[in-house]
Structure formats: structure tokens, C-alpha cells
Curated annotation (Swiss-Prot):
One of its GO terms (biological process) is photosynthesis. It holds the Pfam family PSI_8. This is Photosystem I reaction center subunit VIII. The keyword Transmembrane helix applies. The gene is psaI.
Length: 36
């Protein structure tokens, strides 16, 4: 069972991937509206 190892992988993954997606979508939104 990998249930014990899952949080140790899932938490850093969300902690790194989610902000990266948020920053990427934010930068695309700013470029699309040309708000500098």
C-alpha cells in the first residue's frame, strides 16, 4: 500500500504545481489584456 507515501508526494506537488499554473495563467491574462 502506498497510502502512507502518497501525502509526502502529493503535498509538495500541489505546493509547486498549483502556484506555477496560477502564475502562468495570470501572466497570460495580463499579456492578453496588455495591463502592465
Amino acid at each position: 500500500m502506498t497510502d502512507l507515501n502518497l501525502p509526502s508526494i502529493f503535498v509538495p506537488l500541489v505546493g509547486l504545481v498549483f502556484p506555477a499554473i496560477a502564475m502562468a495563467s495570470l501572466s497570460l491574462h495580463v499579456q492578453k489584456n496588455k495591463i502592465v
